[in-house]
Amino acid sequence: MKRRSYAMLRAAAALAVLVVASPAWAELRGEVVRIIDGDTIDVLVDKQPVRVRLVDIDAPEKRQAFGERARQALAGMVFRRHVLVDEKDTDRYGRTLGTVWVNMELASRPPQPRNVNAAMVHQGMAWAYRFHGRAADPEMLRLEQEARGKRVGLWSDPHAVEPWKWRRESNNRRDEG
């Protein structure tokens, strides 16, 4: 009897660890109510706005070349539309990091789910996100290289500056001023 109680206690403890260790989120659904910039949106979920940062991409900043065009491209895909967000994590600013999916209405075919993060990179409106110089997602890097090769979007500018370099230079100018 003691052995069975001990085994059940261990099983319950293991289950509790799994429940606690598993993220409380997996996905969220809602309507996009605001476009912050080319890689950040507000999604209305249960009447509450949730700030979502598109994971694995880095779009130009608002005041950077192509920043407004990236914001407009994202708005064209998702503004006032219902989306599904596959949540990956939360960043240091409290934003949900995730992959955003939207159904695209195509003539003569049923709606097709579209990975908005990938579409932004493929259209040349964002870079594949880098961590310590390496792309976080190899597929995003492939899409970036394809867009670069076709010179679409920001790749039409031969002097396009990566957002992480632009932010660093912008911070340096602010510190000097």
Swiss-Prot record:
Enzyme class (EC, first level): hydrolase
Cofactor(s) the protein needs: Ca(2+)
Taxonomic superkingdom: Bacteria
Leader peptide range in chain numbering: 1-26
Alphabetized UniProt keyword annotations: DNA-binding, Endonuclease, Exonuclease, Hydrolase, Nuclease, Plasmid, Plasmid partition, Secreted, Signal
A Pfam family annotated for this UniProt entry: SNase
Effect of loss of the gene: Loss of plasmid stability and partitioning.
Job description of the protein: Involved in plasmid partition. An endonuclease that acts on supercoiled dsDNA, converting it first to open circular DNA and then linearizing it. Preferentially cleaves regions in dsDNA that are capable of forming ssDNA, such as AT-rich regions and sequences that can form cruciforms. Has poor endonucleolytic activity on linear DNA, has 5'-3' exonuclease activity on dsDNA cleaving generating 3'-phosphonucleotides.
Protein name per Swiss-Prot or TrEMBL: Protein ParB
Organism of derivation: Escherichia coli
